[in-house]
Design a protein with these regions (language model features):
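Conserved phosphate/oxyanion-binding catalytic-loop motifs
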Residues: 279
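Short, basic phosphate-binding NTP loop
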Residues: 1-40, 49-61, 194-198, 205, ...
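Short beta-strand-centered segment that lines the nucleotide-binding/catalytic pocket of NTP-utilizing
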Residues: 61-75, 112
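Conserved adenylate-forming
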Residues: 28-34, 61, 79-83, 93, ...
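Buried hydrophobic packing segments
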Residues: 21, 54, 58, 235-245, ...
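P-loop NTPase switch/communication element
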Residues: 70-92
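Acidic, Mg2+-coordinating active-site environments of NTP-dependent enzymes
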Residues: 3-8, 102-105, 110, 118-122, ...
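AMP-binding/adenylate-forming catalytic core of the ANL superfamily
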Residues: 282-291
Length: 291
């Protein structure tokens, strides 16, 4: 059956355009995620900061791209593609990955949202690693139930070869189960005994965090120029992932010291007679931690 009015224009008729589009976009660009190490970062809170931290630490040793809510970058270049959505539509995602691959980058960090998975924007991305920061109820207007929201986010660990999970978060079990069923390697972080990247000490001198970690068997000390104790967990996730991707533990820890921060994420603006902090705490747990 032909579509009326198209004349001689070639077209392909598919049952679901949303499902077909990411695969067509990936094919158009030569399946770029297969030429990169793609790390996805998801979670209710902390995914933007963790994505920035990871791109910074990886970028100290390797050319790395970053696509997030707050910025889209390749190496030190701002690409100016940021928009309203955490995860853009599939053609933009694939074009970004293709640009990373063409530039000689080895890694791309994608902030990966539940909407991005449920609306198939990320269907044709081959993930090497999936990082989950935490999970609490959000976007129930879209997903309908908390279980459906968690299941959408768990798509990341079902498709990644390695899952990096927050052992201290109450929602860990669902992601660990999904990763296990998919045969993914599970690496944990947090303060709980027995984790792979354990926060042994978190100190909060003015304007910074000082961290001592057992980082996949190696003890390291790191200084992060950010406020907010919860950012220690974001840093632990980034460090663990960077080490898994071949960055030496001491080099990864040292890279945190030069982290420039994230626009609108515990961003400190020193003024007189008071200090201004700009943050995006949009859920009850995030607001409680920020305050």
């Amino acid at each position: 059956e032909r579509v009326a009015g198209l004349g001689g224009v070639p077209y392909v008729r598919v049952p679901d355009a949303k499902r077909a589009l990411p695969h067509l976009a990936a094919a158009l660009h030569g399946y770029p995620s297969e030429r990169l190490r793609v790390v996805g970062v998801t979670g209710t809170d902390g995914k933007t900061t963790t994505s920035f931290l990871l791109a910074h630490v990886l970028g100290a040793r390797r050319e790395t791209g970053l696509m997030s809510t707050a910025a889209v970058r390749l190496g030190g270049e701002e690409l100016g593609l940021e928009g309203h959505f955490t995860t853009p539509e599939a053609p933009e995602v694939q074009a970004f990955l293709a640009r990373c691959a063409a530039s000689g980058a080895t890694h791309a960090v994608l902030e990966s949202s539940s909407h991005g998975f449920s609306q198939h924007r990320l269907d044709a991305v081959a993930y090497a690693v999936g990082v989950v920061t935490n999970v609490s109820p959000e976007h129930l207007d879209h997903h309908g139930t908390f279980a459906a929201y968690v299941d959408a986010k768990a798509t990341l660990v079902r498709r990644a070869a390695t899952a990096v999970l927050n052992r201290d978060d109450a929602g860990l079990d669902a992601f660990a189960a999904a990763a296990g069923e998919a045969g993914a390697r599970v690496v944990t972080y947090g303060q709980s005994p027995g984790v792979d990247a354990r926060l042994l000490r978190v100190a909060e001198p003015r304007g910074a965090l000082e961290l001592t970690l057992d980082l996949l068997g190696e003890r390291v000390v790191a200084r992060l120029p950010m406020v907010g104790r919860y950012n220690a967990w974001n840093a632990a996730a980034a460090l663990a992932t960077a080490v898994l991707e071949g960055v030496p533990a001491d080099a990864a820890a040292a890279a945190l010291a030069s982290f420039p921060g994230v626009p609108g994420r515990m961003q400190v603006i020193a003024t007189t007679p008071f200090t201004v902090i700009v943050d995006f705490a949009h859920t009850p747990p995030a607001l409680a931690k920020a305050l």
